[in-house]
């Protein structure tokens, strides 16, 4: 009897030691039972167990509490630079590069970075050569990818007053250089359908255009159609079969999984991330989303588009990031319900191999160097 009691006590002590250690050091979807999750903390433990990679964030600051969150969640981020002349902290590229290099150094391996080039210098005679020189320098500094943004196609015009598109001949040598270095192009071309109108307050992206009306093109003549912009993007894919491209924001095909699927079938060098478009998946029939993610589990990368802006309140940032990660994991990994837009959305409970790829493996495959 004493022997039995001793064994029980030893087992309990061993269990306590394991619990005290914290999250596992190796990625494992099975390390936690999703069905047993009853709190956001438990959900985040399950999220952390897979050692997730968020391939789409925008960081301008960091903080000891934020770094602690990254370490606790075993989370790696891809910090993406963007040139945007409407925002003071995105108007100049050099300060962004300097700041992100400092963030990378202070992150202890939790932050990687994606550079960009200045499309507002498109009219310069040396534009292409200068862009290649700059991104090559950034590759030497550790950049793992290059971003092109929606201002190509929706804002910047050439000397003839026409909107420049992603397949403009000036960009071709840049794409060739990215492919030559084995890097990845992160492509944000076009916007959700609602940007072309008519107004739809029920659309998940509607609030963005209330705050950023310059990108709402309804009843604004002279702008390219969404189809024109995406056709130019597709032309880049076809012309550059050796170039890995991640179409961010579900490749701006957020309302049609069938359209995304046809693109993934047509272009083997193309993948998509989920950044800022999870809400569109949430309002799509769960069985359709689940079937799509299982079939194309090698071609979808997890991303959020979360940001840490200058002078942001750290507590608000931590709450926003952690609640987003908890919601997304709960939706994709469990069969519990997620609340969105006043509705109860049934979780997808994706198979473990699919979760491993979407939250980690695909990022490592499609963006080498992470």
Task: Locate the predicted segments by residue.
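Positively charged n-region of N-terminal signal peptides that target proteins for export
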Residues: 1-4
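Bacterial N-terminal signal peptides
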Residues: 7-17
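An N-terminally biased module of ancient metal coordination in phosphate/nucleic-acid-related enzymes
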Residues: 20-110, 129-130
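H/E-rich (His + Asp/Glu) clusters that bind or coordinate divalent metals
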Residues: 31-34, 221, 226-235, 242-370
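Active-site gating/metal-coordination segments in enzymes
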Residues: 45, 94-217, 268, 278, ...
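Hydrophobic faces of well-ordered beta-strands that scaffold small-molecule active sites
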Residues: 53-57, 77-80, 113-115, 146-148, ...
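Acidic-and-aromatic substrate-binding clefts and catalytic sites of carbohydrate-active enzymes
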Residues: 56-64, 84-96, 120-129, 156, ...
């Amino acid at each position: 009897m004493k022997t039995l009691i001793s064994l029980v006590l030893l087992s309990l002590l061993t269990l306590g030691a394991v619990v005290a250690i914290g999250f596992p050091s190796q990625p494992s979807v099975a390390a936690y039972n999703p069905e047993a999750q009853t709190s956001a903390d438990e959900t985040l433990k399950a999220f952390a167990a897979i050692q997730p990679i968020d391939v789409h964030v925008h960081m301008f600051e960091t903080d000891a509490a934020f770094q602690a969150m990254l370490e606790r969640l075993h989370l790696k981020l891809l910090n993406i630079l963007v040139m945007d002349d409407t925002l003071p902290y995105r108007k100049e590229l050099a300060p962004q590069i300097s700041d992100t290099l400092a963030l990378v150094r202070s992150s202890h391996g939790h932050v990687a970075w994606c550079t960009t080039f200045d499309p507002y210098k498109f009219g310069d005679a040396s534009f292409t050569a200068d862009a290649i020189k700059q991104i090559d320098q950034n590759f030497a500094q550790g950049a793992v990818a290059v971003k092109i943004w929606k201002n190509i196609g929706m804002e910047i015009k050439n000397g003839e007053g026409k909107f420049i598109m992603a397949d403009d001949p000036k960009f071709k040598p840049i794409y060739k250089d990215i492919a030559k270095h084995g890097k990845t192009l992160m492509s944000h071309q076009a916007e959700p359908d609602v940007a072309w109108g008519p107004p739809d307050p029920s659309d998940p992206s509607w609030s963005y255009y209330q705050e950023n009306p310059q990108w709402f093109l309804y009843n604004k003549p002279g702008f390219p159609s969404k189809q024109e912009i995406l056709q130019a993007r597709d032309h880049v894919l076809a012309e550059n079969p050796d170039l890995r491209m991640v179409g961010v924001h579900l490749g701006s095909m957020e309302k049609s999984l069938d359209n995304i699927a046809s693109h993934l079938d047509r272009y083997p060098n193309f993948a998509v991330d989920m950044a800022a478009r999870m809400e569109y998946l949430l309002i799509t029939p769960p069985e359709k989303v689940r079937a799509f993610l299982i079939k194309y589990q090698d071609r979808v990368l997890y991303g959020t588009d979360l940001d840490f802006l200058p002078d942001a309140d750290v507590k608000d940032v931590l709450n926003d990031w952690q609640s987003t990660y908890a919601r997304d994991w709960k939706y994709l990994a469990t069969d519990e319900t997620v609340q969105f837009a006043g509705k109860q959305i049934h979780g997808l409970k994706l198979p473990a191999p699919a979760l491993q790829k979407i939250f980690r493996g695909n990022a490592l495959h499609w963006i080498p160097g992470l």
